[in-house]
Amino acid sequence: MAAGNEWEVTEWDRELFQRELESFVPERIFDAHAHVYRVQDFAAGQAPAFVAAGPAVAGVAEVERRLQELIPDRPMEGLYFPYPHRSMNTAAANEFLGQELQHRPGSRGQLLITPEMSPEDIHNAVRRWGFVGLKCYHVYAARERTFEATIEEYLPESQVRVADELGLSITLHMVRATALADVANQQTIRRYCSSYPRMRLILAHAARGFNPHHTVLGIDS
């Protein structure tokens, strides 16, 4: 996509897709990590630059339309959740997501959670909208440098317990400098998964494997 305009699909993008991905991407697509948003759900003037540069409302149909510009003629569904941000009205964002999925039986949604949400809040939202999982994010940790947050700081055990009770998935975008190679991350992932076997933990972005060396170091843990 063109520098300075992440929302514009260029001929370079299309050529890259044809060269590298056309033979790999299946005829039917399920996007397992897709965000939706409304600008109105962010505090005034606080929407991140990527969101501010895009449409005022990016729901499921808009996401599909944009992807079809790059990947035409392939039916698409997905696992959707709101765009996490500290200024986000999470209740409004979750309601928007729930409404978006009412007429998309092939797609699923995850509830955007903050550490302050009670088990009852989660139960009620999941029951109301039929969400299949939870989406936590480090920006909701109660510290200034949230990239150093432990998993427990933005995914407390009480919420993992609810996911286990309801058989929900959790999408975890872990942080800390070495990601999967971080001992604290390893210990928490093992403890949560062994203690709550009905909870399915999705380690987002290939276990945040942006540095392959960290993934190699931590994958056997």
Q: What are the functions of these language-model segments?
A:
Residues 2-158, 162:
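Mid-domain alpha/beta scaffold segments of enzyme catalytic cores
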Residues 8, 132-133, 148-221:
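Catalytic pocket-lining loop regions of alpha/beta-barrel enzymes
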